[in-house]
Amino acid sequence: MKFLLDNCFAPRVAQAIVALRGDAVVHQHDKFARDASDEAIVQALAREGGWTILSGDLNLARQRHQRRALRAYKITVFSLAPGWLDLPLWEQAAKLVRRWPEIERAADTAEAGTMVEIPVSPAAPFRRLAR
């Protein structure tokens, strides 16, 4: 399982997880051109297989056509709930690192193409988003 952290995350947050987890985690800037479209990124990840996207883009969860495309390409997405990106960088990184084992377990068991929301509260369970 490989994880791509999208541009909503500071590259330093991805680097912190890489330092702890290893090369199974990549920031979007390290894999794709800055002007790469979401569609091109999803298609490339689908061709390679085995990718899960971690996104702070709330539109992914809200726009039905994007959810359909991700499901069609069998890309699982973990989307941050509203409020995550309002946190200071250190707190955002700490919460993400704290939940990382849970994210990996959920990614291992999620049906390909599923969208899952990660709440800000560490006590709250992950929530599968509507298809």
Predicted regions and their residues:
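Ribonuclease/tRNase effector modules and their secretory precursors
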Residues: K2, A19, K95, S121, ...
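Acidic, metal-associated active-site segment
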Residues: A36-E48
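A polyampholytic, Gly/Pro-enriched intrinsically disordered region
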Residues: A46-I53, L96-D108
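Mid-chain, well-packed structural core segment of small domains
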Residues: L60-L96
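Charged phosphate-binding loop/patch that engages nucleotide di/tri-phosphates or the phosphate backbone
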Residues: E102-R131
